[in-house]
Amino acid sequence: MQFFSTRDAARQVSASQAIVQGLSDEGGLFVPQSFPQVDVQAVCQLEYPAMAAAVLREYLTDYDPAFLARAAAETYGAAFAGKAGFLAPVEGDTWALELWHGPTCAFKDYALQLMPKLLVEAKRNLGRTEKTLILVATSGDTGKAALDGYHDVPGVEIAVFYPTGGTSEIQRLQMATQQGDNVAVYAVRGNFDDAQTGVKRVFADKQIAEQLAGRNIRLSSANSINWGRLVPQIVYYFAAYAQLLKAGKVAMGDPVDFCVPTGNFGDILAGYYAKRMGLPVGRLVCASNKNNVLTDFLNTGVYTARRAFFKTSSPSMDILVSSNLERLLYHVTGSDTEVAALMARLNQTGSYTVRPETLAAIQETFSCGYAEEDQVAGEIRARWQQDGYLCDTHTAVAFHVARQNKRAGVPMVVLSTASPFKFPRSVLAALGQRAPENDFEAMGLLEQATGRTAPASLAGLRGKAERFDAVIDPEQIAAVALGCQI
């Protein structure tokens, strides 16, 4: 399997090269040359680690299958407490795919617990001996998951950049208290898009690359712009379908709709790959918060990033430039020149418009909707009071949009992307309780109000020493990269 750049299909690399490099030299994202077809029934009979290995080996063809099997078994075992890809009934034929039972209590663990193994093996496959500097822009969950996955990995240094004031306090503490000799964390003045743009500029700067190369260092990414982040996320769509099969809720071939809360479009794009591999995915419903740039695009074909930015109770979705949409545009248009022109227009003017036939092709699979802040709170309250189901703010966005897009007779799986205890103040307030300023007090009150127990990895943050408190401007990200001490 070869991988092409979305902006220049003549640039072809192996899976190992795509994972080591992260981003193509001209700024494009790597996409697979084809969609491998799998025996869905056979895959759905596997346990999660074996299922992951089966999907991974279809794309990572230059990796030893035995290595992939070992890596998947190590990743999705004890760290997920037997709940990898856990599907919970909510009400009727609506289900929650709980993706927050990993070490950092967010869906990013599925990729970022595995990705360090993939990177180290990719370098071995390629005979590469240089050090790797990983730069990560995060709106909350990716940062901690990447830090947890890469800390103390030999030959790797990782720097994470998050928007100051743009995460929950729990998310911030998860990053600020991270242990490891090869990690660094910076708050960036501005929003997530400012941090992400700053990181992308570093990747595109040939002078920085040359200076680092002189020190035997190469840049890479752990954001979902890296193929190694995206491919593990395909697996849990198969896992959800498999559980519905085993429960007798669907017969093989019956469609299942998925509603995904997303800002950067990576998690929902993984569902598109699963569909193209043969999984009977019906509709993929894109759920946005008040920063509803994706809703507008999927309805009109016009992408406008230059708009008001809102800080919401679902901060991991507070994004205006959705990087992974570029991959979908490539798959739908089949044209690298068209995608390159659209991305250039976005960079220059802050917007672009796709052709009507492109929008129509996208709308064959994708539906959309968004939730205002009061609707998010109302959804948290309704799911708890009516169904006894406790969810976080991002999942609540998806539940709201899922109800708008529910098709009679078709099961709906809502991707639950983070533990409700990551956002205890917002969840507590939504339940009509007084929400104290302190997140840990709120966590305790949420436990009392619901009878649920906060994950130990979150409750244990209380009182931990903060190691990182630097605040920088986006323009200083380049200096951070050049100052790394691998």
Tell me the role of every PLM-derived stretch.
Residues 1-486:
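PLP-dependent amino-acid enzyme catalytic core
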